[in-house]
Every structure is written in C-alpha cells, then in structure tokens.
Amino acid sequence: MMPSTGILMAGRVVVEEAPDVLNPEALRQRLNTNDCGAVVSFVGLTRETEGAADVLRLEFDAWQDRLTPVLERLALEAIKRFGVLSVAMAHRTGSVGPQEPIVAIHVGSPHRKEAFQACEWLIDELKKQAPIWKKEVTTDGETWNCLLYTSPSPRD
C-alpha cells in the first residue's frame, strides 16, 4: 500500500490511494482510536457477477492530483458533521479482481450511532465526489461506469 499522502488534524484523518493492494485491516490499525468507544468499518469488494456475466476485473482510474484532497475534505466534513473523532479511508486504483477490496472506510467515534452515520455518508459522498472512474470487464465485454464521479465541488 502506498504511504499516506494525507494525515491531518493531529492524526485524526488518514487518506490513501492504493494502486496495487488494499489491506483494510492494516488501514484500520492506522485509525486513531483514542477516546473512541466505537469503530465502524465499510469494505467494498468486487462482485463476482454483474447481471448474468462473470466479472473478470474492475479497472479504476483516478484524477491523481485531486483524489487525495477530495478524500481529505470528505473525512474532515464527516468529523465536523457527525462529531466523530477520526477517519481512515482508502480506494484502489488499477485492476481489481473479484472479491478483492476496492474501498475501505473506518470511522472512530465515542458512540456507534454517529460512527454508522458518518461511515454511510462517507461512502455515499465518495461515490459522488471522488474523481474515480470504473471500467467493468466481464465475460460479456467492457463497460465504463462514469457515474462514480459527477462533478468537482466548488470548494475544490
């Protein structure tokens, strides 16, 4: 895994782009859990099928200069919005095979409710705002899914 390019707020935010491999547990170990009573995690995996077709792989491309700043901004917004204490998140780029992790999000919080809310919000916003594009390669052919990234935020 690539070293973190963003550690903010005295270690409260860890953001990574993972071009070769994503180890969700190693990322979770980097989450600052001081004063936390809950850690909520989400790990997205490549499905084995899409409709009737077998998935051979997903290929993710990212706007390299913008990915880390967008993820950092989302993590900071989650801390502010939900009152959680820390966020660690990473997204794969490159080729990802079936059942391999694509994205990992870990949220540390004094209480579980806020951690669950923040984690759900983070994956939803990541899919809307992160400059990442996905090509699905299946036994039926190849399809680009450009709906992962809709538009840059005016703050970016």
Show where each model-derived region lies.
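Short, charge-patterned binding micro-sites
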Residues: 44-52, 93-97
